């Protein structure tokens, strides 16, 4: 009977840990399951070894397990309540799939609903259509000899919070009367390091028409932190280091598969995610802003040398954290970019017009995308975009 109880306790703790690691929910409660499992094992041990010195050790383990089991709930109870919540089939079923080179990518051939809610109010309720190639749907030219305009970046390019017909690539294609072969390579949570690696690996090659190419990258200040793996969801991306000429060079993966598994597992605990992971992810030897500038130089280099393309960087200068540091790094490195405030002069004065739900959701609105699309369309058609 005792052996059966031991086996049951061991099975319980193994099931708990595996369940937390590999299932999407419950999140942030890893230590609860570990603590309860340890307590069950320790309780069995205390009865098994009662009257011996091992009994005291089991009692200590029991108390330790009970303490562990309350750490995550305590942290969650003291955390600020989420201002917004994501709902719909996009968040529940689709969102990302693994990618051995870039860390993660979009699923292929799916249509998902994305809802964002705050305080009982629906911020947006939209549909995302992902084509068979893993790109956000964009109506484009069917002429095999036309020029290419490739939009690359993160959620700003992808069009989070917007329907398919409101994204920047789609509005640009509409403004140019489907004159160009337009592809939306945007993936939410990407950084410039993933854009650069995709270009180096020739990811756009199968989708290029025979004409010349333009690569439009939408930049935000947070891409600097993403390039140095400052977030748990970015641990499997490509790593870069600055070369002697200030151009970023590929340096393998940000973390090994084993390290990525450990970090992903630890992130399932609210306590460990708050108090342990920041120290593990921090890389004091890397200057995120200089690296970001080096990545921008590398992106332009690959665009020009590999694709003979004009590289266009749109920089969202919307007064957020790290923006001054990124601008200073760009200026010091001689990185050319187009500030979005140049395209939209009242960007800071009219945040409600150009951001979905400021200050909690700063993604561009369709109105902002229309102005940017019109700017790009005019400059490309009159040949002044590279000037």
Where do the model's predicted regions map?
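Membrane-interface junctions at the ends of membrane-embedded or membrane-associated helices
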Residues: 1-5, 42-54, 381-387
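Serine-dependent acyl-ester chemistry module
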Residues: 9-20, 24-25, 220-354, 358-362
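Conserved SGNH/GDSL esterase-like catalytic core that processes O-acyl groups on lipids
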Residues: 158-243
């Amino acid at each position: 009977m005792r052996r059966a109880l031991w086996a049951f306790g061991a099975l319980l703790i193994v099931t708990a840990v595996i369940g937390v690691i590999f299932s999407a929910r419950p999140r942030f409660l890893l230590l609860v399951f570990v603590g309860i499992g340890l307590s069950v094992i320790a309780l069995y041990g205390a009865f098994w070894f009662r009257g011996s010195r091992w009994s005291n050790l089991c009692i200590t383990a029991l108390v330790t397990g009970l303490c562990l089991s309350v750490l995550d709930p305590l942290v969650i109870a003291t955390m600020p309540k989420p201002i917004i919540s994501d709902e719909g089939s996009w968040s529940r079923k689709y969102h990302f799939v693994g990618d051995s080179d870039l860390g993660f990518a979009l699923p292929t051939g799916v249509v998902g609903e994305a809802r964002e809610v705050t305080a009982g109010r629906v911020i947006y309720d939209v549909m995302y259509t992902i084509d068979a190639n893993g790109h956000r749907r964009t109506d484009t030219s069917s002429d095999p000899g036309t020029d290419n305009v490739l939009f690359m970046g993160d959620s700003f390019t992808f069009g989070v919070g917007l329907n398919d017909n409101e994204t920047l690539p789609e509005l640009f294609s509409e403004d140019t009367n489907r004159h160009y072969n337009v592809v939306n390579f945007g993936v939410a949570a990407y950084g410039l390091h993933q854009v650069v690696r995709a270009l180096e690996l020739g990811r756009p090659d199968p989708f290029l028409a025979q004409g010349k190419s333009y690569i439009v990258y939408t930049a935000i200040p947070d891409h600097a932190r993403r390039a140095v793996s400052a977030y748990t969801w970015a641990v499997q991306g490509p790593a870069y280091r600055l070369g002697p000429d200030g151009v970023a060079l590929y340096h393998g993966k940000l973390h090994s598969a084993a390290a990525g598994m450990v970090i992903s597992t630890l992130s399932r605990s609210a306590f460990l995610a708050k108090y342990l992971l920041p120290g593990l992810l921090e890389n004091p030897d890397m200057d995120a802003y200089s690296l970001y500038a080096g990545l921008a130089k590398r992106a332009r280099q690959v665009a020009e040398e590999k694709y003979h393309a004009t590289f266009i960087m749109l920089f969202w200068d919307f007064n957020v954290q790290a923006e001054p540091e990124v601008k200073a790094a760009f200026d010091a490195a001689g990185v050319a970019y187009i500030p979005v405030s140049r395209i939209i002069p009242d960007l800071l004065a009219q945040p409600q017009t150009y951001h979905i739900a400021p200050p909690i959701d700063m993604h561009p609105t369709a109105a902002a995308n229309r102005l940017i699309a019109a700017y790009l369309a005019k400059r490309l058609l009159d040949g002044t975009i590279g000037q």
